[in-house]
A protein has these predicted regions:
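Short beta->alpha junction loops
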Residues: 33-39
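Catalytic nucleophile-elbow at a beta strand-turn-alpha helix junction centered on a G-D-S/GDSL motif
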Residues: 2-19, 40, 69
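Alpha-helical cap/lid subdomain in secreted, periplasmic
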Residues: 2, 24-30, 43-195
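Short beta->alpha junction loops/turns
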Residues: 11-14, 37, 169, 176
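The conserved SAM/SAH-binding core of class I Rossmann-like methyltransferase domains
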Residues: 9, 34, 107
Length: 195
C-alpha cells in the first residue's frame, strides 16, 4: 500500500516541528519538508514550482507570515506590507489550486513574545501584526475553501511563554514536538481518507 504524500511548506517554525509530525504520521503518510526555509510570502510564491517538483503531492500543508511581518525601524517598513502579504497568499493559493490536485491545509502564524524578541533583534515583531496578518490570510484561505490548522490558537492554549524560546519567536524543543503532534493530529484523518 502506498501512503499519501504530504509536503510541508513553511519557515523555521515548520522546520523544527516537521520531524515530530513526520514521525507521528509514519504509518499513514510519507511526509517531506521543503529543502529551505520558506521565508516570506514573496519567496514562497517564487519557489512553489521548485518545491512541488514533479507533483504527485496528495496534501500540501503551508504557512508563511513571520518573515513578512518583520518591521525595520530604520526603514519604517515591513518586510512585506500587509496588503502585499494578503495578495501573495491569494496567489499562492491560486497557484496550488491550479497546478495541483492536493488537499490544501493552511497553518496560522504562531505567536511572538515581543518584549523578548524585540530586546534581542535589530528588527521588530509585534503580536498585533501576527493577529492582523493571520486575519488577512484567513480571509483568503477560507474564501478559497482551504482547510485551516490553527497553530496560533494551539500555542496560546498551551501557554505562549511555555512554548516559545527566549528569542520570542522560535519554539522550545518541547514546543516544537507539541506543534508537530498537533499538525499530525490534524493531518492524520485527511491522510487516512486518501488511502
Amino acid at each position: 500500500m502506498s501512503f499519501p504524500k504530504v509536503l510541508l511548506i513553511g519557515d523555521s517554525i515548520t522546520q523544527t516541528y516537521a520531524p515530530a509530525a513526520a514521525e507521528a504520521l509514519r504509518e499513514v503518510a510519507h511526509v517531506e519538508l521543503i529543502p529551505d526555509n520558506g521565508g516570506d510570502s514573496t519567496n514562497v510564491l517564487a519557489h512553489l514550482g521548485d518545491w512541488l517538483g514533479g507533483g504527485g503531492w496528495d496534501v500540501v500543508h503551508f504557512n508563511c507570515g513571520l518573515h513578512d511581518l518583520k518591521f525595520d525601524p530604520e526603514k519604517d517598513a515591513y518586510q512585506v506590507p500587509l496588503e502585499a502579504y494578503e495578495a501573495n497568499v491569494r496567489e499562492v493559493v491560486a497557484w496550488l489550486q491550479r497546478e495541483t490536485s492536493a488537499r490544501l491545509v493552511w497553518a496560522t502564524i504562531t505567536p511572538v513574545v515581543e518584549e523578548w524578541h524585540n530586546a534581542c533583534k535589530p528588527f521588530l515583531r509585534h503580536e498585533r501584526d501576527v493577529e492582523a496578518y493571520n486575519a488577512a490570510a484567513l480571509r483568503v484561505v477560507r474564501a478559497a475553501g482551504v482547510e485551516v490548522g490553527d497553530l496560533h490558537a494551539f500555542v496560546v492554549e498551551r501557554g505562549v511563554r511555555q512554548m516559545i524560546c527566549p528569542d520570542g519567536v522560535h519554539m522550545t524543543e518541547d514546543g516544537s514536538r507539541a506543534l508537530g503532534h498537533e499538525v499530525a493530529g490534524f493531518l492524520e484523518p485527511i491522510c487516512r481518507a486518501l488511502t
